[in-house]
Structure formats: C-alpha cells, structure tokens
Amino acid sequence: MKIVLATNNKDKVKEIKAFYDGYEIYALNEICEPFEIDETGSSFKENALIKATAVYAKLCALKLENEFIALSDDSGISVEALGFAPGIYSARYSGKDATDASNRKKLTCELHKLRLKKSGAFYTACIAVASKFGNFSTHGFMYGTVIDEERGDNGFGYDFMFMPDGFDGTIGQLDVKTKLAISHRSKGLELAKYILNSLEKYYK
C-alpha cells in the first residue's frame, strides 16, 4: 500500500514522512499534476475529508486506487482571546496571498489590538484517509499559549509563537524529535496508524 498526501507543502510532507518512516509516501505532485481543492468545509474534519476524497478521485481516474490511498491533514491554531480565531482559516488568516510570515504578523497585531502579549491557545489537526474501503478520520490536539513575538528557527506556520504546555520555549525552539513527540499532527497521525494498519493487509 502506497500513500499519496493531499498536499505539496514541503514542510508538511517532510513531517509526515518522518512520522511514517515505514510507509511509501508521495507528495501529490509526484503522482499527478497539482490541482486546486476548494476547502469549503466549516470544520477541520470537513476540510480534511474534502481534500482526501478529491485526491482519491484523481487516483481512481488514473486507475491507481488498488495501489494507493489518499491521506490529508487539515490543521490550525485557535486563540482564546480572539474568539478561537483563526481556526480553520489559519493558513489564509492574513488574506488570499497569505504567507506564514504575514499570518504571524496579523496574529501579533490582533493580540496587540486587545493590548495582550499572550493568550491561551490550542492547535487542532484532523487526519483524513480516503480509500476503496471508505473514508476515515482522526483528530489530534496540542494545548498551550500563543505569544506576541517569534522565537526559534525550527518549524513553520505559527510554531515560533506557540509555547506548548509544559515547555518554556516555543515549538520553534524545540528539536524535531521533541516536536514529533508532542505535536497535534503527530497525535492525529498516531491514531491514523490504526486505520493504515487495518487497510494495509488488503493491499498486499
């Protein structure tokens, strides 16, 4: 059984490959021409399933459904002081042409509008799997505090502003091994292993 990820995000691909080192994993652009997927869902789960099923439909069109499954991740940060924004809009928080840097800048500005330097926050990740045997999903969470400054140089997204509970530094200041052990995505991927292990025997 081979896995195609519903993303071309190099950081996500690298992180998922590191976690699932026993599986044969491909980025979307390694299997087919990249295509836009409209994330029209109202939750992380809905968006993750939209992405996974769209990629699986492409696999079926290429007659690869007996060889591959599709796996997607939809994740984001929810900040208590901001009414749990940006949530599902984390990747495009600062607008249509958002970048990680512009999103972090907007988050800092929103905190400062409230005269805050920090707030309770949590990350959510939904992992969705689409296969010829159906669609499945899991969730992972990481709780902590978001701060109004960036620290560290390891990670992406909002990692440099997020201090997980039990740690004195941000995710951006942690080594890769520690991040993989505690992250929301890793927790969701760990639960998804049960799905992958169950499916794998039918693809041999």
Curated annotation (Swiss-Prot):
<dbReference type="GO" id="GO:0000166">
    <property type="term" value="F:nucleotide binding"/>
</dbReference>
<dbReference type="GO" id="GO:0036220">
    <property type="term" value="F:ITP diphosphatase activity"/>
</dbReference>
<feature type="binding site">
    <location>
        <begin position="156"/>
        <end position="159"/>
    </location>
    <ligand>
        <name>substrate</name>
    </ligand>
</feature>
<dbReference type="InterPro" id="IPR002637">
    <property type="entry name" value="RdgB/HAM1"/>
</dbReference>
<comment type="function">
    <text>Pyrophosphatase that catalyzes the hydrolysis of nucleoside triphosphates to their monophosphate derivatives, with a high preference for the non-canonical purine nucleotides XTP (xanthosine triphosphate), dITP (deoxyinosine triphosphate) and ITP. Seems to function as a house-cleaning enzyme that removes non-canonical purine nucleotides from the nucleotide pool, thus preventing their incorporation into DNA/RNA and avoiding chromosomal lesions.</text>
</comment>
<feature type="active site" description="Proton acceptor">
    <location>
        <position position="74"/>
    </location>
</feature>
<dbReference type="GO" id="GO:0009146">
    <property type="term" value="P:purine nucleoside triphosphate catabolic process"/>
</dbReference>
<dbReference type="InterPro" id="IPR020922">
    <property type="entry name" value="dITP/XTP_pyrophosphatase"/>
</dbReference>
<keyword id="KW-0378">Hydrolase</keyword>
<dbReference type="GO" id="GO:0046872">
    <property type="term" value="F:metal ion binding"/>
</dbReference>
<feature type="binding site">
    <location>
        <position position="75"/>
    </location>
    <ligand>
        <name>substrate</name>
    </ligand>
</feature>
<feature type="binding site">
    <location>
        <begin position="184"/>
        <end position="185"/>
    </location>
    <ligand>
        <name>substrate</name>
    </ligand>
</feature>
<keyword id="KW-0546">Nucleotide metabolism</keyword>
<dbReference type="GO" id="GO:0009117">
    <property type="term" value="P:nucleotide metabolic process"/>
</dbReference>
<comment type="subunit">
    <text>Homodimer.</text>
</comment>
<feature type="binding site">
    <location>
        <position position="38"/>
    </location>
    <ligand>
        <name>Mg(2+)</name>
    </ligand>
</feature>
<keyword id="KW-0479">Metal-binding</keyword>
<dbReference type="Pfam" id="PF01725">
    <property type="entry name" value="Ham1p_like"/>
</dbReference>
<keyword id="KW-0460">Magnesium</keyword>
<dbReference type="GO" id="GO:0036222">
    <property type="term" value="F:XTP diphosphatase activity"/>
</dbReference>
<feature type="binding site">
    <location>
        <position position="179"/>
    </location>
    <ligand>
        <name>substrate</name>
    </ligand>
</feature>
<dbReference type="GO" id="GO:0017111">
    <property type="term" value="F:ribonucleoside triphosphate phosphatase activity"/>
</dbReference>
<protein>
    <recommendedName>
        <fullName>dITP/XTP pyrophosphatase</fullName>
        <ecNumber>3.6.1.66</ecNumber>
    </recommendedName>
</protein>
<dbReference type="GO" id="GO:0005829">
    <property type="term" value="C:cytosol"/>
</dbReference>
<keyword id="KW-0547">Nucleotide-binding</keyword>
<dbReference type="InterPro" id="IPR029001">
    <property type="entry name" value="ITPase-like_fam"/>
</dbReference>
<feature type="binding site">
    <location>
        <position position="74"/>
    </location>
    <ligand>
        <name>Mg(2+)</name>
    </ligand>
</feature>
<dbReference type="GO" id="GO:0035870">
    <property type="term" value="F:dITP diphosphatase activity"/>
</dbReference>
<comment type="similarity">
    <text>Belongs to the HAM1 NTPase family.</text>
</comment>
<feature type="binding site">
    <location>
        <begin position="7"/>
        <end position="12"/>
    </location>
    <ligand>
        <name>substrate</name>
    </ligand>
</feature>
